[in-house]
Amino acid sequence: MLWLLLLILYGVYKLYKSRRPLTKFDHFYERAFELEEKKRYGDALDIRNQGIELHTLTDLERADLHLANGRMLLKLKQYEESTKHYDASFKLAKYEKFPYSEGFDEVIEAYLYAGRKEDALIITNGMLKRQSYDQKFKELEPLKEKLLSYEGLW
């Protein structure tokens, strides 16, 4: 009897969770991630875009949603669309302090695949300036050298 009650409560909780209004960053991020895992990429993009439009989120949170959209589109090899989200993310986070992430080299790669080498170099230089608060950004130095010496298509 108790297990039946617990099962019903769990079902009600899952139903509520799937229908609750999205109001916080975590709600948008988690819901979009779940949809992305189910390969419902269009729905995941829509959910994140709803969060981006919500001005109760901080610029850094909205930038993170753009970054997640960019990563998803990069996986789908939609490089130009991916870089549009990265552009928006960097614009929103321009004056914010955010930690180094190992995925930044993939971001730069997306710019190269989209034929935007100059923008890749500008972004890399901007990231390198962030060493003042996070020394891990120094790990992008070899990438900068590679960009400077690189000729042709990626």
Each model region followed by its residue ranges:
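Alpha-helical segment of the N-proximal tetratricopeptide repeat
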Residues: 22-57
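Residue signature of alpha-solenoid helical repeat architecture, marking inter-repeat boundaries
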Residues: 22-23, 60, 98-100
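Alpha-helical junction/boundary sensor with strong preference for TPR arrays
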Residues: 55, 93, 130-135
